[in-house]
Amino acid sequence: MTNIRKTHPLLKIINSSFVDLPAPSSLSSWWNFGSLLGVCLGVQILTGLFLAMHYTSDTATAFNSVNHICRDVNYGWLLRYLHANGASMFFICLYLHVGRGLYYGSYTYSETWNIGILLLFAVMATAFMGYVLPWGQMSFWGATVITNLLSAIPYIGTDLVQWIWGGFSVDKATLTRFFAFHFLLPFIVTALVMVHLLFLHETGSNNPTGIPSDPDMIPFHPYYTIKDILGFLVMLTALATLVLFSPDLLGDPDNYIPANPLTTPPHIKPEWYFFFAYAILRSIPNKLGGVLALVVSILILAIVPILHMSKQRSMMFRPLSQCLFWLLVAVLFTLTWIGGQPVEHPYIIIGQTASALYFLIILFLMPMTSMVENYLLKW
C-alpha cells in the first residue's frame, strides 16, 4: 500500500517539499538560513497577532497602549520584546542568507533570486512601518524623515508625500494606515515565500562547490530536518537570551519618549538594520541623488547575475574573489557603524568613502577579478 503522504493531494505537496525532496549531500550550515527565516516569519506573525489584540492605532493612545501591553497584559512585555528583537534576528538571518547567495553564486537561479529581492523590499517596508507604531520620538521623526525623502521625486514628489501621510504632516491618518499595512504585509511576504520555494524546487538547491550535484543527492528528511532543528535551537536560544537579558540593546532610548512634533531628537535614525542604507543616503549631499543611491544600493542585487563573469559559479575555489567578498562585508559593517553616528567630521568622509567602495566593489572590482581568475585558469 502506498504511503498516504505520497497520495493525499495536500500531504504530497508537503512531502515533495520537506520530506522526499532530493537535496545535495554537501550543504553546509549556510543553507540553514532559509528555514531560520521561515521560523522568524512565524514568530513575528504570531507575536504580532497577539500584540495587535491590545494595540490601538490612534496618536492619542498608541504610546500608552504599548505601555499597557508591557505593564498590564500577561506576558505582554515578552510578546513586545520578542517581536521587536525578532525583527533584528529576522534581518540578521536575511543578510546572511543574501550573503550566502552572493558567495556561492545562488543568484544564477534568476527567478528565485528576483523573488528574493522582492521579499527583501517587502520585509524592509514591513519593518519600517512597524517601527512607527509605538509612536515614540524616533517613530514619529523616523517616519517624517524617511517618507519625506519621496518629495525628492520630480514634479509629483510633494503630492505623493502628502498622499502617503493622509494630510500635511505625519499624524493620525498616517499611523492608522501604517498599522493596516504592517498587519497585511507579512501575509504577502508569506505568499512570496511560497513562490520563492516553488521556483527553488524547480531547479533544486545550489551547493557550496557550485558544481551540479545530481549524481549525489540525499533525502531532505531526516538529514536536513535534523540539521534545521539544530539551527532553530541555536537561533531561538540567541533570541531568548537577547529578549530576557538585554531587550533594549538594539533599540533607541528616544523611543521611550512619547512623539512630540515640536521637539526634534538630536540624531534622527532608523533601526540598526537600515543603518548601512541610511549611511549611503546621507553620504550624498543632494536629496534626489541620496534617494537614488539608497534604492540602487539594494536594487544592485538584481544586476549581480549579469555581472557574473567567472567560469566558476561558487567562490569556493576563487581566492581573489573571496578577498573582495570579505572586503565588501567589512565595508557593509563600516556603513552600519557610520549610519548610527551623527553627521559630523570624520564620520561624513568615512561614510562617503565606504559608500563609494560598496558600489566600486560590486560594479567593477568583482567582475574584473573574475576575468583575471578566468585568465589564470588557463595556466
From Swiss-Prot:
Chief location of this protein within or outside the cell: mitochondrion
Binding positions (heme b b566): H97, H196
Annotated PROSITE patterns: CYTB_CTER, CYTB_NTER
SUPFAM superfamilies found in the cross-reference section: a domain/subunit of cytochrome bc1 complex (Ubiquinol-cytochrome c reductase), Transmembrane di-heme cytochromes
GO cellular component terms, A-Z: mitochondrial inner membrane; respiratory chain complex III
InterPro entries: Cyt_b/b6_C, Cyt_b/b6_C_sf, Cyt_b/b6_N, Cytb/b6-like_sf, Cytochrome_b, Cytochrome_b_C_euk/bac, Cytochrome_b_N_euk/bac, Di-haem_cyt_TM
Positions with a binding annotation for heme b b562: H83, H182
Membrane topology of the entry: Multi-pass membrane protein
One example GO MF annotation: metal ion binding
GO biological process entries: mitochondrial electron transport, ubiquinol to cytochrome c
A family per Pfam: Cytochrom_B_C
Cofactor list: heme b
Binding site for a ubiquinone: H201
Assembly mode: The cytochrome bc1 complex contains 11 subunits: 3 respiratory subunits (MT-CYB, CYC1 and UQCRFS1), 2 core proteins (UQCRC1 and UQCRC2) and 6 low-molecular weight proteins (UQCRH/QCR6, UQCRB/QCR7, UQCRQ/QCR8, UQCR10/QCR9, UQCR11/QCR10 and a cleavage product of UQCRFS1). This cytochrome bc1 complex then forms a dimer.
Entry function: Component of the ubiquinol-cytochrome c reductase complex (complex III or cytochrome b-c1 complex) that is part of the mitochondrial respiratory chain. The b-c1 complex mediates electron transfer from ubiquinol to cytochrome c. Contributes to the generation of a proton gradient across the mitochondrial membrane that is then used for ATP synthesis.
Family the UniProt entry places it in: Belongs to the cytochrome b family.
Additional remark text: Heme 1 (or BL or b562) is low-potential and absorbs at about 562 nm, and heme 2 (or BH or b566) is high-potential and absorbs at about 566 nm.
Name of the protein described by the UniProt record: Cytochrome b
Source organism (scientific name): Artibeus glaucus watsoni (Thomas's fruit-eating bat)
